[in-house]
Amino acid sequence: MMRSSSLQKNIMLLRVGSKDSTRFRILILNFGPQHPASHGVLRLVIVIIGEVVTKLDPHIGFLHRGTERLVEEHSYMNAAVFMDRLDYTTVLTQTHAYCLAVEQALAKSRLCIRTQLLRTIFDELSRILNHLLSIATHALDIGTMAMLFWAFEDRERIMELYEYISGARMHTALYYPNQTLDHILTNELLAKILIFSRNSEKTYTEIYIALYNNRVWRLRLCGIGVVSTEISTSTTISGPVARSTGLQLDMRSGENYQYGYYASLTLRIFLGISGDSFDRFIIRLRELFESTRLIYNSLIELSAYINISVYNMCSYSNNPHLKIESLIELFRYSLGEYLLNISLVSGFVESGKGIFGIMLAANNTNRPYRLYIRSPAYMHLQLLPKLGAGHHIADLATLLGSIDVVFGEVDR
């Protein structure tokens, strides 16, 4: 990103008018950090000639909370809740990355197939939450309000599932390193997830019918914010932004890296052709259907590995998590009595925005020595100066909506 001083120097290179004219018609605008279309506290210093953007300088840091530093002051168990506060539109996938890093440092994990399946199910529910909000707010920025009401109906159903299993609608604190999820398994939970997976496709179809062939929607998105294949291979972009260029990059289907239960599921990766905003919209919309299919297949697999009557929370005599031994182990773990050997580990997941990663340095204590967060939205935000130059100022809202930026994980 350019600093404001270098931006002021480059302004002098822009001339408007006749060859003999020495006057400069340059207008510098501040877009944000309180603009409703900035998707958070983003400030853009824009240099325009007429309505065409010639220079773009993003400024971040207005939401900095020092998460990477705060984690160093808490035990491995207690630090997991900080991950929920980063990208608050897809909370569970980020906590999953942290759990993978800590479990790698433990060198052994007692997680059963049931827990891996449940993590996969709730990761896909978080992806649906993210894509629904991304498409709805993007359409709202363009001028379509109906998508917001349709999308939030399904988001409400998912948040009711979160509330059922954890008591919280957004920051669930559901995943913890090396901890199973058997205690949340009930007949009612699986029935709720199954009903949602069958009924949600109606909303996705309505969004497709309303937007795909909409002339205004296509005019505002097609050819806007084109990311070339060279940029996708030479930068650190990921997720729908990278896949819109034709780059097949998805951590769920990696040959050298697998997590959750994705290795046993059939995953379809959707790629774009032109790399513009419309391709990114189509990829997110198709991933909504794909996530629903993965949830349904995971429920089928889960039914083969579990006897619900044994792990039902209502059957107190059969629930192992209600025994005193499990309670003592949980207290010891939460108090930080578990030490991790000196190691440098990492955990990566495919979140709704792209590859989210946690790099962790352990030093034989009960808390991290150092933690680094790889935010996909931060990587995508660096594309704005290239994508915005040459477009009209009205297209900035389209660009921001198509790269899907949330500043909880950008500033962190």
Swiss-Prot record:
Protein name, as recorded: NADH-ubiquinone oxidoreductase 49 kDa subunit
Main location per the UniProt record: other
Bilayer-spanning residue ranges: none
EC primary class: translocase
UniProt keyword terms in alphabetical order: Hydrogenosome, NAD, Oxidoreductase, Translocase, Ubiquinone
InterPro entries linked: NADH_Q_OxRdtase_suD (IPR001135), NDH1_su_D/H (IPR022885), NiFe-Hase_large (IPR029014)
Gene3D superfamilies: Cytochrome-c3 Hydrogenase, chain B (1.10.645.10)
NAD listed as a keyword: yes
EC annotation from Swiss-Prot or TrEMBL: 7.1.1.2
